[in-house]
């Protein structure tokens, strides 16, 4: 459908859009600040024009209320959400949970209606206070790892209650509704024991499928972190450990394709080979490979650490059946993703009409561009280009010519009016509204633009009307 899309305050360009845009969701981890040297990553290192959604990992829980974890989370929140001042289309979410968080805090919280209500109330207050646009659940996993079977249903109940509370709160304060998303399992047994897929999908805005960590040193043989397809020798449950099978399992069991977001890892799993001369897929291993100098995690290398491994003479191979690379040197073997595999997966994603890509994590890509000689954020940039987001607008909130605010003293009139015309409005319209665009009553050609509580009125070009379904100027 041809639309005229608003880019900045009064600037409109003709943009041909075919269907809805893909999501490119990137996780930021609040422990990346502790990596040494060039590995240290802060919110200021994020390119605000790279991803459509950013998720801050992680928040914690205390007394059934959401809390900070790191000593400087509040400061980091400010910088993280401040990125929206450079990209008016960017959405930010806060994730709660994670692998190390475990299941017990979630189990306790969902166990009673009172506990759930306490949590939901705290989440709304917390997200509004720190200017996030939504919450991402990272419960690993309902019904597994010590979580009782009833948590499968109670997770649905929690998400439903939270979605309904978000809708009610948005109406009460006349702000855009907070989003609710979830990072979900890729292991079939964890999916079956953890999620009521059709019901859960009804209430979640997006479902971030963690299609990585599919193989690792815990298995005792080499394997790819995030293979697109199964390996020819994969049998039994091993045949399920690939992106294609997992994503289609979610879709075939009741999740709408457009809500399913495919997980992309910017890291690899490394191994110690039992026999350095046996370097193929499925070769015996004796444990996790060495920690890298920056991520400092045994068995895992950031993409930029893998680039150093390759530069130092490692042999690179291509796992053709699974469409992903691997590399080895001496007794160390690593399975990972690169630009080629990211592009192949992105084309597959589009062919299957999934909703977009999710990246774990933005701080593990070569964000400085100094390790891989492929520019900054080479992997995520590959996704951005492949998903057609390369030309998407990235502009700061508009600075209109004349804001609708109280006139300076001595000007002789009560309140200004926009030089772009439109129906009259007062300075109080945006005082209780989130940043964004809003329709003007009785004037379809005009719209309000709220920026940090200040009200601006702007008009669409002649013949166009403001369309709330896309926050754009559209044909009447």
Swiss-Prot record:
Domain of life: Eukaryota
Keyword Hydrolase found: yes
Domain Chitin-binding type-2 span(s) in chain numbering: 427-476
Gene Ontology CC entries for this record: cytoplasm; extracellular region; extracellular space
Alphabetized UniProt keyword annotations: Apoptosis, Carbohydrate metabolism, Chitin degradation, Chitin-binding, Cytoplasm, Disulfide bond, Glycosidase, Hydrolase, Immunity, Inflammatory response, Polysaccharide degradation, Secreted, Signal
Any Gene Ontology biological process: production of molecular mediator involved in inflammatory response
SUPFAM superfamilies membership: (Trans)glycosidases, Chitinase insertion domain, Invertebrate chitin-binding proteins
Phenotype for residue 61 to M: Increased chitinase activity
Active-site residues per Swiss-Prot or TrEMBL entry: 140 (proton donor)
Name the record gives this protein: Acidic mammalian chitinase
Originating species: Homo sapiens (Human)
Gene name for this UniProt entry: CHIA
């Amino acid at each position: 459908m041809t639309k005229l899309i608003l880019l900045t305050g009064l600037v409109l360009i003709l943009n041909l859009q075919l269907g809805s845009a893909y999501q490119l969701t990137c996780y930021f981890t609040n422990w990346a600040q502790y990596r040494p040297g060039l590995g240290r990553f802060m919110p200021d290192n994020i390119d605000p024009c790279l991803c459509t959604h950013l998720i801050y990992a992680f928040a914690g829980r205390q007394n059934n209320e959401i809390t900070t974890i790191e000593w400087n989370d509040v400061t980091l929140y400010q910088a993280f959400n401040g990125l929206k001042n450079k990209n008016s289309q960017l959405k930010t979410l806060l994730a709660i949970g994670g692998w190390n968080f475990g299941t017990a805090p979630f189990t306790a919280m969902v166990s009673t209606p009172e506990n759930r209500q306490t949590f939901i109330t705290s989440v709304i207050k917390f997200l509004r206070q720190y200017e996030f646009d939504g919450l991402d659940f990272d419960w690993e996993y309902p019904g597994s790892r010590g979580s009782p079977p009833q948590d499968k249903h109670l997770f649905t109940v929690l998400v439903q209650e939270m979605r309904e509370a978000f809708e009610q709160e948005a109406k009460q304060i006349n702000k855009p509704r907070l989003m609710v998303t979830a990072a979900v399992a890729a292991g079939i047994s964890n999916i079956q024991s953890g999620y009521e897929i059709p019901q859960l999908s009804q209430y979640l805005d997006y479902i971030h499928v963690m299609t990585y960590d599919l193989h690792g040193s815990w298995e005792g043989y080499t394997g790819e972190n995030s293979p697109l397809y199964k390996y020819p020798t994969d049998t039994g449950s091993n045949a399920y450990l690939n992106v294609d099978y997992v994503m289609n399992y979610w879709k075939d069991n009741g999740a709408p394709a457009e809500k399913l977001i495919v997980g992309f890892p910017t890291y690899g799993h490394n191994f110690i080979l039992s026999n350095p001369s046996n370097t193929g897929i499925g070769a015996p291993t004796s444990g996790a490979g060495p920690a890298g100098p920056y991520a400092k995690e045994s068995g895992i290398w950031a993409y930029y650490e893998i680039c150093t491994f390759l530069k130092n003479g490692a042999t690179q191979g291509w796992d053709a059946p699974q469409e992903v690379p691997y590399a080895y040197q001496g007794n160390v073997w690593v399975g990972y993703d690169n630009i080629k595999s990211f592009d192949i997966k992105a084309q597959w994603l589009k062919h299957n009409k999934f909703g977009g890509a999710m990246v774990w994590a933005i701080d593990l890509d070569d964000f400085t561009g100094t390790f891989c000689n492929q520019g900054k954020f080479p992997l995520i940039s590959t996704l951005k280009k492949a998903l057609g987001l390369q030309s998407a607008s990235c502009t700061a909130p508009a600075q209109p010519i004349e804001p609708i605010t109280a006139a300076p003293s001595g000007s002789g009139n009560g309140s200004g009016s926009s030089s772009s015309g439109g129906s009259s409005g007062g300075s109080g319209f945006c005082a209780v509204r989130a940043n964004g665009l809003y329709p003007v009553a009785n004037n379809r050609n005009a719209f309000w633009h709220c920026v940090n509580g200040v009200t601006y009125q702007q008009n669409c070009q002649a013949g166009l009307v403001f369309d709330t379904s896309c926050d754009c100027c559209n044909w009447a």
